[in-house]
C-alpha cells in the first residue's frame, strides 16, 4: 500500500499546486493521448495498457514541460502498478472486499452449467432413464442410451453454447454486462420447462440446445466482469473461482443423482427432480446481479461518466477524501485508456486476433490452453458414473465415487490457490498434465485385468485424476486465457478460445462415447492408455509454447509478446514497459523489437524500454 499512498499524496500536491492552472490552463489528457497515439502508430507498443496514469495533467503553454509531465505520469503509473503487484491476498481482500464479492456473485452463474452437464452424463447410468429412453442391449440384457443419442445430446448443448457466445458480444455492447446476464438467466428459467416436461430424447435435445445459449453467456462474462472490476492482486483467485463453481455444480449433481438412485430409481422423479432443481438458481442470482454495479469500463465507453463514478464508489472500499481521490484516479485511468483505444483503432475484429504475428501467437496460446482441458482426457471425469458402471461397480457405488471425486476437485482448487504463491501458471499446468498421464496409464493397465479388484482400482484412480486435474490445468486455464490477449481484443479472444474448446469437445465426446459403450469399442478402463498419450502430447505443446505469466502485469505481458520473447524465457526476462512508454511519448527512435531484445540493458539509475535476462 506504500506505493498507492505515495501516489495519492502526490495527486493531492499536484492538484493544489496546479489550482490556478486548472482554471485557466489546458487539459493535457487529450494532448497526451494525441502525442502517444501518434507515436503508437509508429511502434508496436500497446498503449492501451497505460492504465494507471493519474488522469488530467496540466502543462503550461511551454511545450518543453511536456516530458516532465509525462515522466510524472509514468512514475504514478509505475508506483500504482508495483503497489497492486506486491499486494498480499489478505490486504487485497481488505482493500477491495466489495469488488471481490460482486465478482464471486457473477461467477456463481457457472454452477448451473457444471450442474446440468454433469446430470446429463449421470442420467446415462440411471436405470429409470435408461429404461424410458434407451434400447435393450441383446448382449448384456440391459437398457442403454444409444451412442448416437448420447453424441447428439452433447452436440446440442455445445451448439447452443457456441451460439450463446457469439450473441453475448453484441448484447453486452447494447445493454451491458448486468442486463445481459439477467436476460440469460430469464431465458434459462424458461428453457428448463422443456427439460422438465420432456417426453422424448428429442425434447431433451431441444432443451439442451436452448439452455446452452445462456451457458455460453455465463462462460464469457464471468471472466471479463471479474477482470474489469477487480485488482491485479486478486486476478488468479477470482478467475480460477470459475473452475470452483464448475466443480460445485458437478458435486451438487452427483449428490442429487445419488438421492435419485436411492429413492426414485423406478420413478420419473429420478430424472425430473434434478431438472426441476435448476429453477433454484435464476431468481436469486438475477436479483443479486441487478443490485451489482455495472462495469465502469462499459459505462465510460457509453459516455455515462456520472454512472461510472457511482459504480466505482460502490466497487472501491474506504471513505472520505482518500476514497474520492481513488475513485477519481480510477475513473481517469479508464477514460484515458478508452480514449487511446478509440483514437488508435476501432473496437477490433475477430480478424485482428490472427492478422499479425503478435496477436496470432496470443490467440493461438489462449485457444490451445482451453483445448488442453479436452485433450488431457478430463472429459472422462464428466462421465465418471457411467465409467464406474462399465468398470464393474454397482450404480449406487458409482454415484458415491462421483461425490468423492468432486469433493477432491474442490479441495484441489483450494490447494491450487495456495500453490500459486510458490508455483507459476506453467508449473501448475505442466505438473497436472504429467501426473494425469501417469494415472491414465495405470488405469489402462488395470483395464487389462478383469478382476473385481482391478475394476475398483481403476475407479479409485479416476478420482486421483480428478484431483490433479483440478489442481493443475482446470483452474489455471481460466487465468491464462484472461492474461494472453491484449486489452482491445480480450473479449473476442476469449470467445474464440472457448469456441475452440467447444469444437474439440465435440470430437472428444464422440471418442469417449465409442470407448465406453459396450456396443461400440467397449474399451472401458483401457481408454486410459489413449488419454495418457494425449496428456503427454499436451504437455509437449505447453513446454514449447506456453509462457509463464505469474507475477506479470498486463502491460509487462504486452511488452514480452511485443519483443517476441520465447515462452520459456518469459519468467527470466526483465522488462521496463514504462520506460518504453516514456520513450514512445518522447518520440525517440523506435527500434525493431528483436533489436531491443538483443541490445537492451538495465543500468543502476535508468533502464531502456525493453528487456534483460536474469
Curated annotation (Swiss-Prot):
It is a multi-pass membrane protein. One of its GO terms (molecular function) is carbohydrate:proton symporter activity. GO terms for cellular component: plasma membrane. Residues 130-144, 202, 258-272, 386-398, 449-460, 515-526 are extracellular. Gene3D superfamilies: MFS general substrate transporter like domains (1.20.1250.20). GO terms for biological process: maltose metabolic process; maltose transmembrane transport. InterPro entries: MFS_dom, MFS_sugar_transport-like, MFS_Sugar_Transporters, MFS_trans_sf, Sugar/inositol_transpt, Sugar_transporter_CS. The keyword Transport applies. Keywords: Maltose metabolism, Membrane, Sugar transport, Transmembrane, Transmembrane helix, Transport. Residues 38-48 have a biased composition (Basic and acidic residues). Its main location: membrane. Residues 1-48, 594-614 are annotated as: Disordered. It is found in: Membrane. The chain crosses the membrane at residues 109-129, 145-165, 181-201, 203-223, 237-257, 273-293, 365-385, 399-419, 428-448, 461-481, 494-514, 527-547. Residues 1-108, 166-180, 224-236, 294-364, 420-427, 482-493, 548-614 are cytoplasmic. Transporter for maltose. Belongs to the major facilitator superfamily. Sugar transporter (TC 2.A.1.1) family. This is Maltose permease MAL61. It comes from Saccharomyces cerevisiae. The gene is MAL61.
